Amino acid sequence: HEAKTENAVQANMELEFKRNRERFGFLKWGSSAFHNMLVVPPGSGIVHQVNLEYLGRVVFNTNGLLYPDSVVGTDSHTTMIDGLGVAGWGVGGIEAEAAMLGQPMSMVLPGVVGFKLVGKLRNGVTATDLVLTVTQMLRKHGVVGKFVEFYGEGMGELSLADRATIANMSPEYGATMGFFPVDHVTLQYLKLTGRKDETISMIESYLLANKMFVDYSEPQVERVYSSHIELNLSDVEPCISGPKRPHDRVPLKEMKADWHACLDNRVGFKGFAIPKEAQVKVAEFNFHGSPAQLRHGDVVIAAITSCTNTSSSVMLGAALVAKKACELGLEVKPWIKTVLLQALGVVTKYLAKSGLQKYLNQLGFNIVGYGCTTCIGNSGDIDESVASAITGNDIVAAAVLSGNRNFEGRVHPLTRANYLASPPLVVAYALAGTVDIDFESEPIGVGKDGKKVFFRDIWPTSEEVAVVVNSNVLPDMFRATYQAITEGNATWNLLSVPEGTLYSWDPTSTYIHEPPYFKDMSMSPPGPHGVKNAYCLLNFGDSITTDHISPAGSIHKDSPAAKYLLERGVDRRDFNSYGVAVVMMRLWHVHFANIRIVNKLLKGEVGPKTIHIPSREKLSVFDAAMRYKSEGQDTIILAGAEYGIGSSRDWAAKGPMLLGVKAVIAKSFERIHRSNLVGMGIIPLCFKAGEDADSLGLTGHERFTIDLPSNVGEIRPGQDVAVVTDTGKSFSCILRFDTEVELAYFDHGGILQYVIRNLIHSKH
């Protein structure tokens, strides 16, 4: 975001339309070219919240034929709809495009993990504390590729918004979906959000008749699940997660000790390796004429943001914290970048009705708009003086956000420590100005009367929050907000677009280009490809994220993408995010360009480089890949567990394909990324259980041969495949084409090529 004032929403929406006119025009053209395509106008809110409160049907009624609602979406947090009792999950953009063209979705029948909830949350514990606890438990249990179904008497204690928060975080705990069956709480929510009474009655009758409705006030039959896990809600305690992964939960009472351990620990998910003598460093700087200081752990970004933590209880809870803080005379340091980004306009309405928005404004949390910002790295620059103090003194600065992901380099390039927290805790940490604090024994600040103010002085009780929620969140707010979806807004309605069913590509555009995947495509499938004497382009450890592979968020001023745009006359103020700019297509060297990436070929060095094995030269990943391609050499990637964790970003598969990567050999893959690799024709292989590159003695300096039959009919999903190296080592891997149709995609060179050939054949 750019503007942060009382009229920030309008100012930022105008900027959004100005910068995204070409993109919005393309989408609006699509909505007129295709009869069954609805485009929700920009500024309406984040898609998952719109799904939950407006688009979700729960039960479809098509000319009197009733059947359950379902959804797939190109964002991994599509799972939020599972909180409403609608089966839904995220898929890669490639797979979604194929589905839009009529290709059925295929999957291996998943195991179902039963998650039993009992008891009740303690006073002052938030839905965010619960979801971070659930995320840690399920990551430890292991649920990748599985469904999780929540049940138990504790369900009656959770609001629909609480359930949606847990469902939203399914990608962070690794499940395909986290499902909450429909009950009376679901029906009450449908009424709250403005659904018609007759529709709600139809939903209840259909689900009761089909034994798909649950009444938690009655005794429940214990169902049989693939595996089982249980949580007593009274055991959940206030917590945050970080500094580098969503499932690294830290109880609030242990945060100060955990922070100091992270400073000491070697570089890793829980370590920064700051020498003892450097841990007390104070960076002096000048902030717009006033002296200022930064220390390790100081907060420079505090953001109430994302689609995850948008429930009325946590949003109004944050506002109550702000109210108490303002009344006691507390302030946020002026160099902390504060962000309040809403998932939808209803939040704006109930914050205004409650009279609490003014206190958030007073602390710098003005509403800046509706959409994805800090959570994906789109919060804008921090002040230049703060940035210089961080880089000049090697300060481990912190961001605290109510988002769902905190992977390295994602939130901001200069915040090495990133913590996920509830919206009320975001406000508390902004007031404290540091994560290096024990909230139980140390004051957050000094009030206007000179008295020390503690965390307990500003934290609202559950009863206080409930009173504000019940009196300020009303059905009419939802009806008024979603009326705008059908009516649009003035700027969207005035946007002119070309007519016709074929889009006219503009070759001079830096934004939208014709994709290169069908260039020179013949009607005959190319057939399966093996890998011959391939070099290892990159050798990774565990938890390589799609942010490591392919950037998202803002385009940094010194990046190759920025250089490309500047050379084409694009003003820096008009740079947009990687995710929507054509630099993704033209600048293949933005892939694997994350400054925090660790490539084992570099023997401990951190950064986006690799070794060109034949020459032993250290090059950028792009330059090394292009040299291999020019020499006619195949390349592969070695990786550890959870390869491709994070966003469902299809560019994390498109980019490696364009770089010439033929296969990825990993301990395990995150579900959506594996699917995306298949969709782009890259072979996913898994080491056998108990094995990895290190245990097999692989350094990445070998050459790898993977023999596959030239006839796809001779390949089976999940079969063993031999991998042979030029050093004489050989080992067996599991071929992670999971279904017969995925083998067909591989035979055709990718899913879109398969679908297009089939469409052409069907026309003839």
UniProtKB/Swiss-Prot annotation:
SUPFAM superfamilies named in the record: Aconitase iron-sulfur domain (SSF53732), LeuD/IlvD-like (SSF52016)
GO biological process, one term: glyoxylate cycle
Binding-site residues for substrate, renumbered to this chain: 75-77, 405, 410, 568, 648-649
Protein family according to the UniProt entry: Belongs to the aconitase/IPM isomerase family.
GO molecular function, one term: metal ion binding
Catalyzed reactions per annotation: citrate = D-threo-isocitrate
Pathway: Carbohydrate metabolism; glyoxylate and dicarboxylate metabolism
Gene name per UniProt: ACO
Pfam family, one: Aconitase_C
Primary localization: cytoplasm
Official protein name in the record: Aconitate hydratase
Function: Catalyzes the isomerization of citrate to isocitrate via cis-aconitate.
Subcellular location: Cytoplasm
Superkingdom per UniProt: Eukaryota
Annotated GO CC locations: cytoplasm
Co-factor(s): [4Fe-4S] cluster
Keyword match Zinc-finger: no
Binding site for [4Fe-4S] cluster: 307, 372, 375
Keyword terms of this UniProt record: 4Fe-4S, Cytoplasm, Glyoxylate bypass, Iron, Iron-sulfur, Lyase, Metal-binding
Cofactor note text: Binds 1 [4Fe-4S] cluster per subunit.
Keyword set includes Transcription: no
EC code(s) of this entry: 4.2.1.3
